[in-house]
C-alpha cells in the first residue's frame, strides 16, 4: 500500500493522459457489453411489462395464432365451473403520426372483472357500460396520451379505419398507473364490437382472458379449458406471450450477444496491451526498486494493485458509458423489432440488471488483473541490471517465440480439424475460437516479418527516417505486438460483418427479383410487417374490376405455433402464384412441389424453417388451426426471406376451410401490359381509399422498405468500424508514446549530430503508418477466415439460409485509408512530444 501511494500515485498524476488511455480499453469493452445487453433486456422488459399490465387479473389466456377465432368460443369457456370471468379482447396498434397507439377492444359488460379502469372524475358513459356500448365511437385514453395531444373528455380523435376515416369521441381519461401505464402510456380502450369493424376482424376475437375461481389449480384449469376447446388453441398464462416474442426475436438477441461479446474480447485485448505497455515502460523503475531491495513479490503486487485500481475506475466509467449507450440503443432496437416482426414496441425505462452490472465489474477487474499478471511477472523476474538497460526488454526471446508458435500451431491444427467436422454447431464455435487464438499468438511473428518486408520500401521513400521507423518495429516487437493484435481483431470483425452483410444483400436481392414482381402491393398500412388491420376477401373482386388491372393475388399471413415456435403461415392461391413466380427449390423438384401444394397435398417450407427447426422433406407437420390440426407433409424447401423464424406456404383453400377466415393482409396486383401504372394506382385509391384504410405501394417502395430494414439490421457494422478506428488511435498513441520514451536517448543523439526536427517527426509518422499497414494486412487476412465462420454460424444458428461466401472488397478498400489516416492522426501528438523534449535530458536519460 505504501509503494502504491509513494510510487504509483505520483506516476499516475504525472502521466494522467496515459493512464486515461490505459483505462479507455476497459471503458470501451465494459461499456459495449453493458450497453448492448441492457438495451436488449430493456426492450424485452418493456414488452413483458405491457403484457402484465394489460392482463390485469387474468390467469390464463386463450389464443389461436394471429388469425383469432370465432365468437362462440367465449360461451364455451364461460360454462366451465372453474372460470370466474372470461373477457374477449382485440389488440392492435395504429400509428398516430407521432408514435404507435395500442388499442384494446374489450367487452365492457364483463371486462371489469379482469381489468380496472381508474378514471378521472365520474363519467356516466363509462360508469354505465350499456351507455358506452350504445355509442360505438366511444374511446378511453390514458392521461399521458391526452396531455400530449391536448385532449379532454368529449374531445374528438380522428382515425383511419377499415370503415374509412372516422372520428372517435374521448369518453374517459384513465389515471396514471396500472393499465394506463402499459405500452408507455400510449393506450386506448374501445368497445370490442366497434374494434372488430375498425380493424376489419369480422366476428372474431384475438384472445380470451380468463380469471379463475379462488383456490382453483392453474394446471387443472388449463387442462380443462384445453380439453374443451380441442387442438389448435393455446391455453397459457399471460407471461407466455413474452416468451413467444423472445423466441421470435431470438435471432437479433443472439446476433447482438455475439457482437457484444467479441467487442468485449477486443476491449480485453486493449486492456492487456495498455497494461503491458505501462509495465514495460517502467522497467527501469522496477530495476531501481529491485536494486534497493524490493522483492519479486512486492514488484508483482505493486503492479497488480495498480491494475486493480485502474480496472475498478475504468469499469465504473464503462458501466456508466454502457448505460448511456443503452438509452440510445433501446429505442433503435425497439423500432427495428417493430418493423421486422410487426410487434409494436415502446421505449420504457432502462432495466438495470444487478447481476449484469456485477458481472461487468467482475469481468473488468479480472481482465485488468489478468492483463497485468504476465508483464508484471516478466518485469519482476528480470535481473536488475537488465531492467536498467534499454531496448533488450522490448525484443521477444527465442524461447518465448517458440512457445508462441507451438501453441499457435496446435490451435491452428485444432481449427482445421473443426473445419473438417464443421457440421456440428458446437464444433464450429470451437474452430472459430481456436482460429482467433492462433492468429493472436502468431501476430508478433507476422508483424516482425511484415516490418522486415516494409523496411526497404520505407528506406527508399525516406532513407533515414524510413529505416529508423522500420528498425524500431523490427528490434522491439513487444512494444507494438499488442496494438497490432487488437487492431487485427477489430478489423477482422468489421470484415466478417461486412462480408455477411454483402452476402445477405446479394441473396435478398435475388429473392426480391423473383418473389416481389407485382406492380403494386395493396396493404392496410405503410409497412408490410403490420398485421393490425385486414381486408375482407371480397375486395379482390373490386380490385380486379379496376381498369388496367390484369391479375390480383390475395395473400394471408398469420403466425402460429409450429414445433414450439411462432412460424409465419402464408396462404395464397399456389396455382395462380406459381405461374408468375417460382422460387427455385433448395430441396425437391420445383414443378412437383408447386403442383402438390396447389392440390393441397403438402406444404412448402422455407430453408430457414427447415434448418432452424430441424425439418426435412417428407416430414408431416402439425399446423394448429382453431379447433383442429392441419397435417401436411413437406413437399419442397425454398429460399424465402419473408420471416426470420421461417415460413410455411400453403394453398388458400386450406386456410379458408381450417381457419374459417377469408381476410387478406396484402393483395399482389399486376397491371395489364401497356397500362399507365400511375393512373391505375390512382384509380384504386379513388375507388377504395375513402371507403376503408388502404395503401397502394409500388414495387420500388416495397423493395426500398425491405432494404432499409436490412440496412438497420447491419447498422452494427458501422459501430464496429468506429470501434476499430478507436482501437487504432488508442493503441498507436500508446505504442508511440512508449517508443519515444524508450528511444529518448536515441532520438536525442540523432538531434545532437544534426538531425532535424522534421526528420524526427517523419520517423514517428512513418512508424505509426507502418503499424497501421501491418494491422490492416493481418486484419484483412484474419477477416477472411472469420467471415467463413460467421457465414456458417449465420446459416446454422441465425438466419438458417445458405449464404454464399463473399469477401467485402469494398469494405476493405474503405478501411485501408480510414485506418492509415487514423494512424497518422494518432502519431501527431507523440511526434510533437518527441521533438519538443529537452535534448539535455534525453542525453542524460541513462
Regions found by a protein language model. Give the residues of each.
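Peri-transmembrane interface segments
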Residues: 47, 227-265, 280, 302, ...
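Short beta-strand boundary microenvironments
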Residues: 101-147, 529, 537-546, 550-617, ...
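Small-residue-rich transmembrane alpha-helices
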Residues: 275, 309-342, 355-381, 410-423, ...
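Alpha-helical transmembrane segments, especially those used as permease/efflux helices
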Residues: 2, 13, 17-21, 254, ...
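Hydrophobic, regular-secondary-structure patches
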Residues: 19, 23-108, 126-135, 147, ...
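Interfacial "coupling" helices/loops that link adjacent transmembrane helices in transporter permeases
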Residues: 15, 245, 269-311, 391, ...
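Small-residue transmembrane helix packing/gating motifs
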Residues: 54, 131, 148, 176-214, ...
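Short cytosolic juxtamembrane segments of multi-pass membrane proteins
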Residues: 381-397, 833-846
